Amino acid sequence: MPSIRLADLAQQLDAELHGDGDIVITGVASMQSAQTGHITFMVNPKYREHLGLCQASAVVMTQDDLPFAKSAALVVKNPYLTYARMAQILDTTPQPAQNIAPSAVIDATAKLGNNVSIGANAVIESGVELGDNVIIGAGCFVGKNSKIGAGSRLWANVTIYHEIQIGQNCLIQSGTVVGADGFGYANDRGNWVKIPQIGRVIIGDRVEIGACTTIDRGALDDTVIGNGVIIDNQCQIAHNVVIGDNTAVAGGVIMAGSLKIGRYCMIGGASVINGHMEICDKVTVTGMGMVMRPITEPGVYSSGIPLQPNKVWRKTAALVMNIDDMSKRLKSLERKVNQQD
């Protein structure tokens, strides 16, 4: 278990220390579950009343909240961001052994950097290049001529097809598939003719991809995931999609082929986005959004009907089904009124 003096933690976080700097911090916890040795954080003033019951040895908070502190405190401008950074310092995620498992199958032409770890039953095909400190989990497959940049990690059972490029310091969770064929077919009098998908997938630096997500290779041009992009679990990224730098994609999102999404966008969970169009920079699509047309202006966009009691929803659905008839009747009434005038 990692541990650190509170004074040393404050220095690493560039935080202002209030209280005993010799307190030993052994972990991060929520305000409700924290015990002695834990550090917690408060992001909303409404939780001030809980400080008296909190058992944490220290709390991260803003200057405005400091008068309510009942323990040692680290004062920062952004407690949530500080929480993320101190969680990295005190991370308890198991690290793999720095070795190559005897059962791993590695082609003789593969190039491995320094301190590469490869887990049991992983397969590394010919022409693969793994940078320094790359971690390949148990059961992973890395196809021919693919390249994975320094410091990147694949958890167990990740599949990377051939000719894929993954940048530095990326993290890909278990079950994800990168580089499978895109959904490309031509119709010949009712019969589907497969179009070989000869593009690649290019993933930038510092990209994180959740579990069981699929990113298809391009048909001709590449599918591209920009630097700093984060993609949640069970997303489908179709062929030739381009996602701009630092865009966030929540779970269950489906992106159709040849979609281009700008930088700094946020796509809410379970959204469905049409292909062969563009979304500009700094767009937020709220959960379950259905995006059928290009978005050319930054902002927040929503679609769908939020949850309602069933009886209310049934009435709303009936109104929607009859809206065309109601519109025609309204126009007819308007014409009659205008004629009377």
Swiss-Prot record:
GO terms for cellular component: membrane. Pathway: Glycolipid biosynthesis; lipid IV(A) biosynthesis; lipid IV(A) from (3R)-3-hydroxytetradecanoyl-[acyl-carrier-protein] and UDP-N-acetyl-alpha-D-glucosamine: step 3/6. Coiled coil: none annotated. GO terms for molecular function: N-acyltransferase activity; UDP-3-O-(R-3-hydroxymyristoyl)-glucosamine N-acyltransferase activity. Its EC number is 2.3.1.191. It catalyses: a UDP-3-O-[(3R)-3-hydroxyacyl]-alpha-D-glucosamine + a (3R)-hydroxyacyl-[ACP] = a UDP-2-N,3-O-bis[(3R)-3-hydroxyacyl]-alpha-D-glucosamine + holo-[ACP] + H(+); UDP-3-O-[(3R)-3-hydroxytetradecanoyl]-alpha-D-glucosamine + (3R)-hydroxytetradecanoyl-[ACP] = UDP-2-N,3-O-bis[(3R)-3-hydroxytetradecanoyl]-alpha-D-glucosamine + holo-[ACP] + H(+). Gene3D superfamilies: 1.20.5.170, Hexapeptide repeat proteins, MurE/MurF, N-terminal domain. The active site is at 239 (proton acceptor). GO terms for biological process: lipid A biosynthetic process. InterPro entries: Hexapep, Hexapep_transf_CS, LpxD, Trimer_LpxA-like_sf, UDP_GlcNAc_AcTrfase_non-rep. Keywords: Acyltransferase, Lipid A biosynthesis, Lipid biosynthesis, Lipid metabolism, Repeat, Transferase. It is an enzyme of class 2 (transferase). CDD domains: LbH_LpxD. NCBIfam families: lipid_A_lpxD (TIGR01853), PRK00892.1 (NF002060). Homotrimer. Catalyzes the N-acylation of UDP-3-O-(hydroxytetradecanoyl)glucosamine using 3-hydroxytetradecanoyl-ACP as the acyl donor. Is involved in the biosynthesis of lipid A, a phosphorylated glycolipid that anchors the lipopolysaccharide to the outer membrane of the cell. Belongs to the transferase hexapeptide repeat family. LpxD subfamily. This is UDP-3-O-(3-hydroxymyristoyl)glucosamine N-acyltransferase. The lineage of its organism: Bacteria, Pseudomonadati, Pseudomonadota, Gammaproteobacteria, Enterobacterales.
